[in-house]
Amino acid sequence: MDRERKEKRNNRFTTKMQKKLVVLYLCVLLAFTGLGARLILINRDNGEQYEKQVLSQQQYSSRTIPYKRGEITDRKGTKLAVSEKVYNVVLDCKLMNEKEEYVDATISALTQCFDVDEGEIRSYNEANPDSQYYVLARQLTYDEIAPFQELEADEETGRYIQGVWFEEEYKRNYPLGSLASDVIGFTSSDNVGSYGLEEYYNDELSGTNGREYGYMNDDSNLERTTKAAVDGNNLVSTLDVNIQSIVEDKLQEFNDTYKDAVREGNGARNVGCVIMEVDSGEVLAMASYPNFDLNDPRNTDALIGQNMVDADGTVLEEVINEAALSSMDDDTLYRQLNYLWRNYCISNTYEPGSTIKPFTAAAGLESGALSGNETYECAGSLTVVAGEKPIKCHNVYGDGVLTISQAIERSCNVALMKMGQTIGETTLLKYLEDFNFGLKTNIDLAGEARTASLVFTEDTMGPTELATTTFGQGFNVTMIQMITGFCALINGGYYYEPHMVSQITSSDGSVVRNIEPRLLKQVVSEETSAKIRDYCLQVVIGENGTGHTARPAGYLIGGKTGTAETQPRGNNEYVVSFMGYAPADDPEIAIYVVVDRPNAENQDDAKFATRIVRSILTEVLPYLDIFMTEELSEEEQQELEEAQIAYEQALVSGNDVSGNDADENTEGSSEETGTGTDGGAEGSGTDGTGPESEGESSADSGTTDGSSDADGTDSSSETPADNGGYTMDDITIDPETGEGVLPDGTRVDPDTGEVIGNVELNLPESNLPLGEEDEGDSPF
């Protein structure tokens, strides 16, 4: 009975449970049915959105694929700037820590193959065990990472080396080091160009980074999606590395000769040279000294010997040495580096001196103000404004009656001032502007100086300013303005825009753009241009020419010397220059050399520049297949050999080999306040060095007495031309022959100082006998 009751109770419980289970099952079924319906609705309405979200959550890895910055080559394909693939060593601590045996094996391999500290790795790993990106070494070459990759590939050791991978990037490299450093520029750590072509063409050289994504797909397989990098374009520059090398070698030789000669520091504050094709505006070479290593632009060794620059951008007399360098704060150091990196040939401004005289003559001839048959009498000075001091010529006794050609040949200031009075302010300013003085040339380089406020206008030019402008004082120019205008002056009058790049190509070598010579205007006629060429030829070969020492043996060239006294007047500091072309009968190239304050006792000597020109052209002209047209006489051969011996002796002794001939010396500088020299930044007036290197200085002065070379006295005392600038006191007597001997070895008559023997110095005549004081100014 009890048993029957128990069975009935169990049966009732089982039935009850079955009913509950059925109800529960139905509820669950209903819930899943509702959930399924909801999912269907969600997928229908928002499926694509949620799919993207899920995929983004499933992303497994991502890395940047760096682009390759474009190359820069010279006109013949020699590589000047390239980008080389390098590798960063990256440690994934989280992966390395997955197994204990991985840690020691991986760290051991790293220290064995790379210059890394084991203690630092372990300390970092302990502090950051989940880190997945720890850079151990940067910018290694493939050869440097190869030993580690071999260890990884080894079956026995490789399985324990985990968590190390190599991040690819590109490193900018300059195969020729410091060659053309001012022109090329360099890149910063973020691959952005600074200075030169690197900055100007940064957008062309830059590419676009690519990306590689990895994620797990629906089948739990790793999927990868890659967006390729787009490499930058390449530049074919107009430079010729062979010509560039010749130029830089000669500038270096000049510095080696005059470094620390009279004062501590480089051979000059700056020395610049530009060589340009006359009929295209293409720059074959552009260099200045000092330069720097493009692969290590922040190496402070290059600053030794450079003048200090203050916070206002003014260049000081103080020279950087080891002691000064060690005491500089970061701001001061960066300021000095910025001055080093700027391109003197386009960023610095200065008064041109007598190199402007051919432009003055051209303005008169082309405008019709001058016929070319005029003559001018030079009595040694000219009173421009009644009651004011006269502006003196280099020869205070006067040059006599001169034609235009003779005035250019002798570099007579008085004759040029009289031409200016005939030409007039409006016409002269018009032609100077036509030659782009006061305007940018728009050369394709970063940092070209603005000079709009560094030249006179009709509002600021009076009679004195007109007079001094005719011979190159009171206004400022850049080297690129001068040589570009000079090319137009002697090529038939055709003004081409100067440029540094002739072609842009893609990474696969296809041509993106050809940059053809751009003819902007004709500034003078063929007839006027031919006359100017004749005038400039006489400067070099004429009996009284000031540029004899620029002529390379066997060639005829034309050109013009220049010497300009810097601000403040009377400081005996000068910018000397020579601007020329070759060959004389059919110009192919123009060359312009500027020496800014040579490190010598007597700076006012154009031969500091002409000798550089001669040494450069002696090598460049044969390289360009421009052949000699003049036979070398025995006398000329002897002169060349003796000049070479004298120069080599000077290199050994450190003596001044400038010669200081009056006829190539200071070319009458006026006392007007003018614009100063080397203005670059924010109107500093002296070597401006603002961050953009494109500042302007004021040109609204130049209104004092206008006398030349400060007060016009003792500017070239006892430095007659015939004897290299030496005086009677410099003569010693050879006891064997009784002849007089000058410090440079030249033999002279001990009583008169006249050169004896067969050696001719090819110098113009002096109006003064040796030992007699010349109180005037030397010609530009």
What residue ranges belong to the model's regions?
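Substrate-binding beta-hairpin/strand module that engages nucleic acids
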Residues: T383-A386, E631-E634, E639
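Short, mixed-charge low-complexity intrinsically disordered segments
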Residues: E636, L640-A650
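Beta-lactam-recognizing serine transpeptidase/beta-lactamase-like catalytic domain environment
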Residues: D2, A81, Y87, M216-A228, ...
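Short, surface-exposed charged micro-motifs
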Residues: F578-G580, D730, G745
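Short small-residue beta-strand/loop micro-motif enriched in glycine and branched aliphatics
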Residues: R513-N514, N599-Q603
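Periplasmic/cell-envelope proteins involved in peptidoglycan metabolism and beta-lactam response
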Residues: M1-I320, T349, T426-L432, R569, ...
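Short coil/loop linkers at secondary-structure junctions
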Residues: D115-D117, L370-S371, G438, F627, ...
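Disulfide-bonded cysteine-rich modules in secreted/extracellular proteins
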Residues: G725-D734
